[in-house]
């Protein structure tokens, strides 16, 4: 698959990667059609998702079955009047349907806004208003539903509310019932035109240092930007069973359990749980023979407190971490207990993986790795001049004639904030680092 999108697909060194990473960019690229449906045609029986939960349930879905489900879901969403450029907010925790709906919305050109289940009424009204949200698809969690219902009278742009219920629970007033309705939709017909590469595909609300959250808008090439996340940072292949610990309301979900993993042809493993418990997580990894794992350092800290000798983790091949600084002591203890060196990475909601430790490198505890070759990264002083080695500075992305694949397109409806972060040929991350 990746040979369709990269001129060179294998690299043996940092120098090789930096020199030869080059994307093949199709016109009007759409991840749902050009990657997922392509896998369905090429390897329909290959497992795409292995979803499990803390109630002992599991769902195994092949690429072929996932195409059928996403087509059906896309058709259903169309019957509700949802189409190109319509913003749709998803509050779905780790429910299986999140993966189906994400792809279905991509197929009809709608704008997906994943959101956390912790939002209050105020948060929901703010998002609905700022993004002109047209529909909300949510879990049947009583708190989530209550906050959405409280926001209804102050959300005039929202025309459809859809809930995904569990085991026959009653449908909240004012909501469509996903389970009983989506399979009744007519056969899906792909729209004649869905998107250009520059159209907005995905938006995240991300908190700033002050004020209300920013709306980070990504185009359709953002998905391709995560090819390097899954294939090179996570080091995935077609035999991989990959687990990333992340709620679907945050950007880490598309980093770790969606785009890059499926570019690699891997199987996405999901553990849907209400409360984190290291022992339960480790038993899931043992039971299903997870081969690749990614989580924030905090999760690893909980894991190394367990007696890891109790678990058969012999299937585990590769581990990565991002989201916060990795304490070298955690790195050392995990390596001591498992023989696996964690490969750290760095990025933002505004980017894909910007810095990373790649398979052809020996990880250095306390280091985020090297710049990802799809970005031109530098460290600069407050006056804009480059930092010397060992000198602390701001991480910036140099932007040439064309925006790098994976970098956000704008802060939606906020040109002033966009200019503050993106000027003089640089995207300013606001994050500080030093180079050895």
Residue ranges with predicted function:
Residues 44-47, 162-169, 174-176, 182-205, ...:
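Conserved pre-ATP/AMP-binding loop-to-beta segment of ANL
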Residues 45-103, 120-125, 178-180, 221:
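Conserved AMP-binding/adenylate-forming core of the ANL superfamily
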Residues 59-64, 193, 201-225:
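Conserved AMP-binding A3 loop
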Residues 67-72, 183-188, 216-237, 251-252, ...:
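Conserved structural elements of the adenylate-forming
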Residues 103, 107-180:
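Structural core segment of the AMP-binding/adenylate-forming
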Residues 179, 263, 290-295, 304-364, ...:
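Gly/Ser/Thr-rich phosphate-binding loop
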Residues 224-244, 248-291, 306:
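Conserved AMP-binding/adenylation subdomain of ANL enzymes
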Residues 388, 396-436:
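Conserved ATP-binding/catalytic segment of the ANL
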């Amino acid at each position: 698959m990746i040979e369709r999108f990269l001129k060179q697909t294998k690299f043996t060194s940092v120098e090789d990667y930096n020199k030869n990473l080059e994307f093949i960019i199709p016109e009007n690229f759409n991840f749902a059609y050009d990657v997922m449906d392509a896998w369905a045609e090429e390897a329909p029986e290959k497992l795409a998702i292995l979803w499990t939960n803390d109630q002992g349930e599991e769902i195994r879905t092949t690429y072929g079955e996932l195409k059928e489900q996403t087509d059906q879901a896309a058709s259903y969403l169309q019957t509700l009047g949802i189409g190109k450029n319509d913003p749709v907010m998803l509050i779905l925790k780790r429910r299986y349907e999140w993966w189906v709906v994400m792809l279905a919305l991509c197929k009809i050109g709608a704008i997906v806004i994943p959101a956390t289940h912790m939002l209050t009424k105020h948060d929901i009204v703010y998002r609905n208003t700022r993004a002109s949200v047209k529909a909300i698809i949510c879990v049947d969690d009583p708190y989530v539903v209550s906050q959405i219902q409280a926001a209804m009278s102050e959300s005039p742009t929202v025309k459809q509310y859809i809930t995904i219920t569990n085991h026959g629970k009653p449908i909240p007033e004012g909501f469509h019932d996903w389970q009983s309705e989506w399979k009744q939709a007519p056969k899906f017909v792909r729209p004649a035109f869905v998107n250009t590469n520059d159209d907005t595909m995905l938006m995240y609300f991300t908190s700033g240092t002050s004020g209300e959250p920013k709306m980070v808008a990504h185009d359709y090439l953002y998905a391709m930007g995560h090819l390097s996340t899954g294939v090179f940072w996570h080091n995935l292949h077609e035999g991989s069973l990959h687990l990333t610990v992340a709620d679907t309301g945050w950007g880490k979900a598309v980093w770790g359990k969606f785009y890059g993993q499926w570019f690699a042809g891997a199987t996405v493993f999901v553990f849907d749980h209400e409360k984190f418990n290291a022992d339960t997580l480790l038993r899931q990894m043992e039971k299903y023979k997870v081969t690749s794992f990614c989580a924030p350092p905090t999760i690893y800290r909980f894991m190394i407190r367990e007696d890891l000798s109790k678990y058969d983790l012999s299937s585990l091949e590769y581990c990565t971490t991002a989201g916060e600084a990795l304490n070298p002591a955690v790195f050392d203890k995990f390596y001591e207990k498992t023989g696996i060196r964690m490969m750290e990475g760095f990025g933002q909601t505004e980017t894909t993986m910007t810095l990373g430790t790649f398979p052809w490198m020996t990880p250095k505890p306390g280091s985020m790795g090297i710049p990802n070759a799809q970005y031109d990264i530098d460290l600069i002083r407050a006056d804009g001049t480059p930092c010397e080695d060992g000198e602390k500075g701001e991480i910036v992305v140099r932007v040439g004639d064309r925006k790098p694949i994976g970098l956000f397109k704008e802060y939606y409806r906020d040109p002033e904030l966009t200019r503050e972060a993106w000027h003089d040929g640089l995207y300013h991350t606001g994050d500080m680092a030093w180079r050895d």
